[in-house]
């Protein structure tokens, strides 16, 4: 259907750029026809917790996953790849938020457009103004470097009768 990912082409592209692509698929997703071993592509096991890996990545490519909102905290580039958007929505897959309003940013609706975006991508890219707006809606104004201090203070000042000694 032309909407899937050509792993051979992607791997060749990654080899030339000395880059590694990590796939973390939805646990219900079954991968077929991945009989070759790719030098620059890894499929993470469905049980792997991807969150400890995220700070060491340069870019997130995602479809409808809520990881989009968590990755905003890293102030790194995000490419949305809803290649099956029409099919996804037609199957009455409810999203928690309006997809267009709450996932701003660069979008690729086909593998060809994804490859074009990756070819031109500047890995120094940070969040767009709209992505920062969404980050503020979900995470507030607290700078991440102070988050532990702010959370501790909140617990102490607003906690129940259980006191926290620090």
Predicted regions and their residues:
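Donor nucleotide-activated moiety binding/catalytic core segment of transferases
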Residues: 22, 27-69
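Short, contiguous acidic/charged loop-to-helix segments that flank catalytic cores in large enzymes
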Residues: 43-51, 102-105, 141-142
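C-terminal alpha-helical cap of glycosyltransferases
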Residues: 144-166
